[in-house]
A protein has these predicted regions:
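Non-catalytic C-terminal accessory modules of carbohydrate-active enzymes
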Residues: 3-5, 9-20, 25-107
Length: 107
């Protein structure tokens, strides 16, 4: 993808708009394939950006009201994304023990 700086720049553009639709080239966090993308910043050496975009997704797209999920909660996928991200963790690599680390919502 052109190196860490290029990856970070492309991710910044990708997260300019949240949930603009499944056919948009911007982030659509209401679908499972997008759930791990905020943690790609960690692997590009920009963990503060992971923390910033995850908190933005939590604040803007999730709520405790009916319809408070940004998409279809297929088998609890979006709910578990929220719980993991609120803990400041994400199982970024399936089948590998360990987590990508973010910023916990709680003290």
């Amino acid at each position: 993808m052109g190196g860490k700086e290029r990856v970070t720049t492309r991710l910044d553009r990708f997260f300019t708009t949240l949930n603009s639709g499944m056919r948009s080239e911007m982030a659509y966090m209401g679908n499972e394939p997008s759930e791990g993308i905020p943690w790609v910043y960690d692997f590009a050496g920009a963990p503060a950006r992971t923390q910033k975009v995850v908190r933005r997704i939590q604040d803007e797209l999730f709520s405790a009201r009916p319809g408070g999920l940004p998409g279809n909660d297929d088998a609890g996928s979006l709910s578990s994304w929220y719980v993991f991200s609120a803990l400041g963790l994400y199982p970024a690599i399936p089948g590998v023990a360990g987590f990508a680390v973010g910023s916990p919502m709680y003290r």
